[in-house]
Amino acid sequence: MENKKEKTAPDVSVGADTEQPISKNTISSISENGGNIKSFEELQREMQLRSAPSYLQTISMNELFDTQYRSKQPLIDGLLYPGTYIFAGSPKLGKSFLMAQLAYHVSTGTPLWNYTTRKGTVLYLALEDDYRRLQERLYRMFGTESTDNLYFSVSASQLGNGLDEQLARFVAEHKDTKLIIIDTLQKVREVGGDNYSYANDYQIMARLKSFADAHGLCLLLVHHTRKQNADDKFDMISGTSGLLGAADGAFLLQKEKRTGNAATLEVSGRDQQDQKLYLIRNTETLLWDLQKAETELWKEPPEPLLDEIAELVMKDNPYWEGSPTALVALINMDIQPHVITRKLNVLAGRLYTEHGILFRSERVHEGRKLRFWKDNTENA
């Protein structure tokens, strides 16, 4: 067994974006049977090939499994993930109150409806409000319990006319930004954005999604619904299907009676199961409380490999490094060394989420080296 300690943990980003390997923001594993490091001439030829108009970037299945991607850490377990989401509902339904509630809980890291919440900076563009109304609303909802991680603005530029730069600057100045709420989407659409074609809607969402993915954060876009009913309730979202088609998911808030306090929140997305939550609005604080969930949150089945690593390898060690063969010798599992490396590339996100352990695989002169270390910045 090889066991070493380092004074400082290696700098590895564990974030949200699953589309990019850990090569710029993370680390890219090399195939277990990979060759020598590429020469300058090989890299030059590869760059020339990539610049050709006919070049199509592909990745083999072997390369896919030999690459470690960053996992999407949820902002709110089972409910809100990094990506671009539409939050739709009829006007004057209480959407902005629920947005303030989400923003407050993420900025403080306090559980929302008993769902675990991860703390981060939040920017709320309340573009249909003013600061006086915001102050009164927040005081009614939370009293004077405040937070330094929640920022508001009641004016912003439009897409293609300054908003992109404003958001990029805010994120650059607040590195731990996890959530940006734009209330409402219509307020930031480009001038002449009344063109509700599929192509136009898809392009708008793709542009916003590109920003959210690049920064590994959640972009929540408040939007309205149509008056007409639809067999699929998400078809009630105003605009064309291009909005939902390009988004990572959507939330749909509906009241049973417009004058009542009961509502349903339906959730559909790529990174969470479809679900329906039954909410009730507190008449004093105007906070939304959870009455019940129609379905229990789906949980991934236990993964013995991760439990073995947490218990046998990392229980008394803040840091461990060694070869895949050395790791296999430590755990009570029948698994081949090259298989364990690939499996850990896939499960690295779960290892961090469930046990607070970071993982890196890299090739050195002696062969492949695996490294594990505990993250002390937050609890697992």
Regions found by a protein language model. Name each.
Residues L80, A103, Y124, D183, ...:
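Conserved RecA-like P-loop NTPase ATPase core
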Residues R70-S71, L93, T116-Q203, S210, ...:
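Conserved inter-motif catalytic segment of the P-loop NTP-binding fold
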Residues Y278-A380:
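DNA transaction DNA-binding modules
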Residues M1-P53:
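Short, small/acidic-rich helices and loops at N termini and domain boundaries
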Residues E46-E145:
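The Walker A/P-loop phosphate-binding site
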Residues D130, L134, L159, L163, ...:
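Helical mechanochemical/support elements of P-loop NTPase systems and associated helical scaffolds
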Residues S71, I86-A88, K92, S96-F97, ...:
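Phosphate-binding/switch region of NTP-binding enzymes
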